[in-house]
Structures are given as C-alpha cells and as structure tokens.
Amino acid sequence: MTAGSGIIHQEMPKGDPAGRMHGFQLWANLPASLKMTAPRYQEVNSPDIPQVTDDDGTHVRVVCGNFWGATGPVDGIAADPIYLDVSVPAGKRKALPVDTTRHAFAYVFAGSGKFCNASDPLAVPTEPVSWADTRPPAEADNRALVLFDRGDEVMVQAGDDGIRFLLVSGRPLEEPVAWYGPIVMNTQQQLQQAFEELERGTFLRR
C-alpha cells in the first residue's frame, strides 16, 4: 500500500485452519516530493512470490526487488527496497549480498543464528526479556531485530533449528521525518496540518 496523500484502510488476513499466521508491517518512507502522490494498493498472493534455492538448501522468497535472478511482484516503491524472506538450514553459514549504498536490517521470526558485522547493539529484542537472560549478545532469535553497518554482504550462521528472517534493504532518503501514530510527514507543521484535516474530514483527497 502507498498511503500518498491519504488513505483509510483495513486488512482482514486469513491464517491457517487454526487461525495462525505470520504478519509483518513494514513502513517505507516516501520522499517529500511524493508525499501527496495518489494512494494505491497492491495485493500479492503467496503463489506469486518467487522462491530461489541455493545448493546448501537456503531458501529465499523475493517479495520485492531483485535477488539471485528472481524479481519480486511488489513494485513502484520510492525507497526501492529489496524485501526477502530467508530460510537458512540448521548449522549452515550463509553470505547474502547487499548493495553498499543501502541500509539493511534483519528481523528474525523463527529459529536462531549469529550475524556477523552487525551494528552495536547486534540484536534488539522487540519483546521484553528477563533480567536473568544470559544469552550471548551475538545470538539473534525469534522476534529480534538486527541492524547492519554498510557493507556488501550479510553473513549469518544458523542455529540448531535453522533460522528464518526477513532481510530488508533500501536506499536512504536523507530527509527529516515527522511521525505520529499512522501519519508520517517531513515537518511538525505538516504533521499538525494532516491531523487537522483528519479531524475536519478533509484528509482524503478524491
């Protein structure tokens, strides 16, 4: 979804027979020149997402961008992201190429592993952890966000149960961000104006 000049939306995802599913929401900022672009929505079904498999059993589903010769179905995003769903088998060590001009992060949602040359802190838990947690800081497991310094590859060593993570990279916009709740602008003045329009019922531009 591209929010552009404004959109009100609702998604009703459908999981497996038990109602379970993985759900992720990634916000990619629009440059100031495109903030008021027309909103649009893309629906992509799972069978439409290409998967490539390496000789060591590593699976990569390409949601957006180009990777290992496959092109993802999601397009037209200004930050030009590469959005990958990566599964590395247990005990395998894998190097994944990344463009040096991009910022990159990984979000682990199954298994565990160790990432090399990540920024400090190496792994940022996205849920509270116990004060008695003694796991070494290099271990990134379920619901951990891993931030990377710039480089030309991401190196991961999968744990005993393998590891599955989202690997996302994009071109930095180098613009100020003003964000509150569901609205992202470039200045506080723009943000205030957007909420005033929302209150008046003039937020949506048809």
State where each predicted segment sits.
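Jelly-roll (double-stranded beta-helix
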Residues: M1-R206
